[in-house]
Curated annotation (Swiss-Prot):
UniProt pathway: Amino-acid biosynthesis; L-histidine biosynthesis; L-histidine from 5-phospho-alpha-D-ribose 1-diphosphate: step 1/9
Biological role stated in the UniProt entry: Catalyzes the condensation of ATP and 5-phosphoribose 1-diphosphate to form N'-(5'-phosphoribosyl)-ATP (PR-ATP).
Protein name listed in UniProt: ATP phosphoribosyltransferase 1, chloroplastic
Pfam families: HisG, HisG_C
Record-level Gene Ontology MF annotations: ATP phosphoribosyltransferase activity; magnesium ion binding
Originating organism: Arabidopsis thaliana
SUPFAM superfamilies: GlnB-like (SSF54913), Periplasmic binding protein-like II (SSF53850)
Taxonomy of the source species: Eukaryota, Viridiplantae, Streptophyta, Embryophyta, Tracheophyta
Main localization (coarse): plastid
Record PANTHER family: ATP PHOSPHORIBOSYLTRANSFERASE 1, CHLOROPLASTIC (PTHR21403:SF7), ATP PHOSPHORIBOSYLTRANSFERASE ATP-PRTASE (PTHR21403)
Annotated spans, Disordered: 1-27
Length: 411
């Protein structure tokens, strides 16, 4: 493996090699670093300082320059963008399947698919960042992406509207990580990192990241000035050990990869909490025929399924003189109130040729974590023949996020 570096940086391959009085000769923003390895994947870095990277981040505290307005192209189909590969792609398709929306691909190599349950909708498989870009350009109307990708490439553009912010997959956070050795051994917070005497205008903190919008924005908001950013694709955890960077800003899920590479997160260093979200083009919802109705159906299915996730229906028979008397017994137990209260129905049986009611059926909805306690309480109240089944959907009278969406659209 050989490392190609500009000559003005070859003198100082690691932070420990910098004399305190020696200024860094920063390369121009276009200077690129490449680690050439036998495998296909490589680490590519482009250095730039805060003032350079922040060309899209206003230095006077105002909003970044707006992206060009989306153009709603005339077409009959609503376009939904899904991630084209990886865990996010599989989880997005699985979630839609759980909502009885089946993505049908004629050929797995094709980038377009159909959802038979939504005949006016096409699915387009794209890279997550391209989903955001194409929502802005008007080539897509809806998309499922991580909030990190939306924030990095959407850059607070008002045409992007979050329809559902918590799809319960793709959980991670964007965080600063530093080495757990050397000069960083006793550094445990963002404040301590910023106050290290090693950083100055001549020798700034070198931060490797793929988030060249969120990174400088976060540092500016926290008043950290002496930072130089290096943009990178992949294998960021190796950058500090290679001497390319002092710290990294990257997505963290379990944190295992950081630990295996002798890196640690710091207090106050989390830039963003992220998970998958359903996003739409505001202009498409306002102007494209059928887009709003399609979003309404997708949103209702999502909300009903996600609300039911981890919930169970519990049914038991209970002897009693009346529904009122049984209800009082059931409601005396703290875990048996259900969503809005227990459903109590008479159980009819025949004795000596006559129909009578000696038992009442109790139906409640309980979360998974309270399931066994609820069963014990039902038994204690006189319940028997307890049946348990998982819930698939809970359709409310109204979908809260739908009302919020209409308000955001001014409808």
């Amino acid at each position: 493996m050989s490392l190609l570096l500009p000559t003005n940086l070859q003198q100082y391959p690691s932070s420990s090699s910098f004399p305190s009085s020696t200024p860094i000769l920063s390369p121009p923003p276009s200077t690129a670093f490449s680690v050439i390895v036998p495998r296909r994947r490589c680490l590519r870095l482009v250095t730039s300082c805060v003032s350079t990277v922040q060309s899209s981040v206003a230095t006077n505290g105002s909003s970044p320059a707006p992206a060009p307005a989306a153009v709603v192209v005339e077409r009959d189909q609503i376009r939904l963008g899904l991630p084209s590969k990886g865990r996010m792609a599989a989880d997005a398709i699985d979630l839609l399947k759980d909502c009885q929306l089946f993505v049908k691909q004629v050929n797995p190599r094709q980038y377009v698919a159909q959802i038979p349950q939504l005949p006016n909708t096409e699915v387009w498989f794209q890279r997550p960042k391209d989903i955001v870009r194409k929502l802005l350009s008007g080539d897509l109307d809806l998309g499922i992406v991580g909030l990190d990708t939306l924030s990095e490439y959407g850059q607070e553009n008002e045409d992007l509207i979050i329809v559902h912010e918590a799809l319960n997959f793709g959980d991670c956070h964007l965080s600063i990580a530093i080495p757990n050795y050397g000069i960083f051994e006793n550094i445990n917070s963002l404040k301590e990192l910023a106050q290290m005497p090693q950083w100055s205008e001549e020798r700034p903190l070198r931060l490797a990241t793929g988030f060249t919008y969120l990174g400088p924005k976060f540092m500016k908001e926290n008043g950290i000035k002496h930072v130089v950013f290096s943009t990178a694709d992949g294998a960021l955890e190796a950058a500090p050990a290679m001497g390319i960077a002092d710290a990294i800003l990257d997505l963290v899920s379990s944190g295992i990869t950081l630990k295996e590479n002798n890196l640690k997160e710091i207090e106050g260093g989390v830039v963003l909490e992220s998970q998958a979200a359903l996003v739409a083009s505001r202009r498409a919802l306002n102007e494209r025929k059928g887009a709003l109705n399609t979003v309404h159906e997708i949103l209702e299915r999502l909300e009903a399924h996600l609300k039911a996730d981890g919930q169970f229906t519990v049914v038991a028979n209970m002897r009693g003189n009346s529904a009122q008397e049984v209800a009082e017994r059931v409601l005396s137990q703290p875990s048996l109130s259900g969503l809005q209260g227990p459903t109590i129905s008479p159980v009819y049986c025949t004795q000596n040729g006559k129909v009578s009611v000696d038992y009442y059926a109790i139906v409640i909805c309980v979360p998974k974590k309270a399931l066994y306690d609820s069963v014990k309480q039902l038994r204690a109240a006189g319940g028997s023949g307890v049946l348990v089944s998982p819930l698939t959907y809970i359709f409310d009278e109204d979908t809260p996020r739908w009302g919020q969406l209409l308000r955001n659209l001014g409808i």
